[in-house]
């Protein structure tokens, strides 16, 4: 896909969904729309809000949706012709092994029609030295989804857990760990940087590194939005994809520091700035 023919193209997003807030599909969709891409959101979970959004209210209503819905919905959408303009697949939060396996089945189904369909896997399983999904789910991500992906976007903790190579304190150590995933392009977020800075690495045919100012606390949903921005830039075959996505997210992080959730107005401002930078229509 070239920079001139993304119009009317869509991306299938299989991830979490909330009714209130911008995490999961809600954070990914505006990132894709910045490039004129449609978003077909297929939820793995449905919650009233992210658990951190209203801690005083207790655990949010909702939960995981049946894993069989993933294949059932995808089968129906395919028969309806909804995937005719499909440009890629982006996978995110998976609450169970069954959801991982169903998502892998959908990717295989789609690639039977479009063998070169790009797939980006955000192997969400933990952060800040804490695994927040069962170990068997993290293992299933490595067994079923990463082998089907052309792009993976783990954070530093996820990379270390998935490869059994933590702690990762040097760029070369991180790059070697990323190669163990056997994914053509691995973008590692929250990689080590000099004091007061944080790095993002692209490990593929070459090693690229972008550094930005470290923000002590960033809102939930930032990783989801980053994967969407990188996916959009990748589909445009933009050679500056890593730098553009990283700088956009750094500006957003700076303006949203110490907030628990992504502010909608800041996401829209980031979207507008990105469109202006790339000379994209609003």
Model-derived regions, located:
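Residue-level signal for inorganic ion chemistry
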Residues: 89, 155, 223
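Charged C-terminal helix
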Residues: 239-282
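Generic secondary-structure signature for well-ordered alpha-helical cores
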Residues: 37, 75-83, 108, 112, ...
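Short, electropositive alpha-helical surface patch
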Residues: 74-75, 99-111, 115, 171-178, ...
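Conserved N-terminal subdomain of the carbohydrate kinase-like
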Residues: 2-128, 267-282
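Conserved phosphate/ATP/ADP-binding segment of small-molecule kinases
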Residues: 131-208, 215-217, 237-238
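Short, small-residue alpha-helix embedded
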Residues: 161, 216-244
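Glycine-rich beta-alpha junction loops
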Residues: 18, 45-47, 95, 125-127, ...
């Amino acid at each position: 896909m070239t920079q001139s023919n993304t119009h009317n193209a869509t991306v299938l997003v299989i991830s979490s969904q909330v009714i209130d807030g911008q995490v999961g599909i809600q954070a990914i969709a505006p990132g894709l729309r910045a490039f004129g891409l449609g978003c077909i959101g297929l939820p793995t979970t449905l919650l009233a809000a992210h658990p951190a959004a209203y801690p005083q209210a207790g655990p949010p209503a909702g939960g995981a949706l049946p894993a069989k819905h993933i294949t059932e919905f995808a089968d129906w959408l395919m028969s309806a012709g909804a995937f005719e303009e499909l440009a890629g697949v982006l996978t995110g939060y998976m609450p169970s092994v069954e959801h991982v396996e169903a998502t892998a089945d959908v990717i295989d189904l789609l690639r039977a029609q479009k063998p070169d369909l790009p797939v980006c896997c955000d192997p969400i399983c933990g952060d800040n030295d804490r695994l927040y999904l069962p170990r068997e789910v993290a293992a299933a991500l490595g067994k079923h989804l990463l082998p089907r992906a052309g792009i993976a976007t783990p954070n530093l903790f996820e990379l270390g857990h998935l490869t059994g190579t933590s702690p990762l304190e040097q760029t070369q150590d991180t790059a070697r760990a990323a190669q163990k995933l056997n994914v053509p392009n691995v973008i590692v977020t929250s990689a080590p940087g000099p004091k007061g800075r944080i790095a993002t690495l692209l490990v593929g045919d070459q090693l690229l590194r972008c550094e930005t100012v470290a923000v002590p606390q960033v809102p939930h949903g930032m990783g989801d939005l980053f994967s969407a921005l990188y996916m959009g830039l990748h589909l445009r075959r933009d050679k500056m994809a890593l730098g553009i996505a990283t700088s956009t997210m750094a500006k957003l992080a700076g303006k949203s520091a110490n907030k628990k959730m992504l502010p909608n107005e800041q996401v829209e401002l980031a979207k507008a700035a990105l469109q202006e930078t790339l000379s994209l229509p609003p």
